[in-house]
Every structure is written in C-alpha cells, then in structure tokens.
Amino acid sequence: MDRTATASWEVMSRRGEQQQQLMMQAPASHNGGSGGGEPARSRWAPKPEQILILESIFNSGMVNPAKDETARIRRLLERFGAVRDANVFYWFQNRRSRSRRRARQLQQACGAALHQLPSAAAAAGAGGGGDYYHHHHQPSSSPFLMHGGGGGGVVTSTTAAPAVAASGHFLADEVDGGGDDDLFAISRQMGLMARHGGGDHHYSSYADSDATQLSYQPTGTIQVFINGVAYDVPSGGALDMAGTFGRDAMLVHSSGEVLPVDEHGVLINSLQMGECYYLVSKSI
C-alpha cells in the first residue's frame, strides 16, 4: 500500500513539474513567435545623390507622383543604392508635410512682420539705399562653358547659383547640420562645378532667393533643367562636360539614361529643349 501511494505521488509530482515547465515555456514561445518572424525593416536612409534627385523632382513641381512615375523615379534612384517604390512614396509624403509646415511657419512670420512694417520702413529710409544697390548690383556668377560655341557658347542660369566653399572634390565633403527639416543641406552642398580662370569653383544647384539673376542669351538658345534649375544653353553644339564640370561628372536624363561623352569629355548629343537632367559624380 505504501509503495502504491509513493508511486502515485511520484507520478503526480512529475506531472506537476511538466505542467510548470510548459507554463514557463509558453510566454517564451509566444515572444519568440512575435520576434522570430520577418525582421523589422530598417528605415531607408537615402544617399546624397538620391536626395539630390528627389529634391530636384519635387522642386520641379512633381510633388505627388503617380504610381508609374514613382516606379520611374525608383529605377533612377537604384543607380545609387537599393530603394523600393514604398520608399519613394513615403519620401514624397513626408516632403509634402515638411513643405506645408514651412508654409505655415512663413505665413505666421509674415503676419508678425506686418505689424513691424512702419518701423522697418523708417529704418530703411534712415539707412539709405546702400543695401538696395548691393542687392541689385552683385557681380554675376561665371556661366557654364559650351564646346565649340565661341563667344556665345555659354550656359546661363535663369536664377543665379550662389557660390559655396570650394574644395578639391566634385561633391562636398561636409554637410551642415540643420535639424530634421534641413533636408536641403545635402543638396545645397552638392553644387555644380564650373572651371573659370584656372580655378575650380563650386556653385550650388539651388538658387538663393536673394541672388541676382543672370542674363539670358538673346538668340539661338534652348531651356533645360539641370538639378531642378532652369538654364539657357545654345541650341547648337554639345556641352563640354570635362571642361565645365570636370572629368568626374556625368549628366543623367530624367528617364535614367546616362548621356554619353566622347574621349575629350564632350557630350555626343546636344541637350534637348525642356528636358530635365541631373548632374552626378562618376566616383559613387
């Protein structure tokens, strides 16, 4: 009798231990199931070249691209790194939100400035016209050179591009910090490079609102967009890429096609009227 009771007690003890182990393993297996599935996708971090292209497209007016346009943009961005259609979609969505927020901030700032107009006008009258002269008589930036164009073979921008600090590289090495909203910083630093007077000068691809406008070529020019900025280029003659932007630069059409150059670094085909191009570096 004692043996039977002892055996029953041992069986019950083992069952209790098994149930306790199962209860302890259940939460662990549940947590493991939730974390052992598809790993959490890391946030897409676009490269500077991808940001430049996205900003140029957004600034050209395409703020909400359709599905087919999103796919075209994604194929263009894939030349510089992995990207998905969803990444492009959400980038434009976030970019529109930032634009609306900035517009509200500017509207509030303008509303506050309305109350200060009388004092500002009085201060401007007392200060004279020196600032006005400085603003409207700044020296123009050097135009881009064209191949075989003679005296008129230049590319001029409809909006001036302010110069930034020159460096030994086509792309800027440093990007100024400016918070989450300052996404333009990388694009501003990735300036177009023009060679003039034996030195290398970097010009920002985005026009400053206070910069002076360069003059148009009177005749024989067409308008193209390079990095979101409108430029007037001679209708005849190909762009001297090596002489204008350096051997490390190349032009990419908005369709994703890289424009070919000859052994001298001159574009084989002329730029087309109204088309969009992006200036990027070959060393990426």
From Swiss-Prot:
Record GO cellular component, one term: nucleus
SMART domains reported in the protein's UniProt record: HOX (SM00389)
GO molecular function, one term: DNA-binding transcription factor activity
DNA-binding region (UniProt annotation): 39-103
Protein purpose: Transcription factor which may be involved in developmental processes.
Family in the record: Belongs to the WUS homeobox family.
Protein name: WUSCHEL-related homeobox 10
Keyword terms: Developmental protein, DNA-binding, Homeobox, Nucleus, Transcription, Transcription regulation
Taxonomic source organism: Oryza sativa subsp. japonica
InterPro entries: HD, Homeodomain-like_sf, WOX11-like
Keyword DNA repair: no
Gene this protein is translated from: WOX10
UniProt key word ATP-binding: no
Pfam short name (any one): Homeodomain
A single BP term in Gene Ontology: adventitious root development
Main location: nucleus
Compartment list: Nucleus
Region (Disordered): 1-43
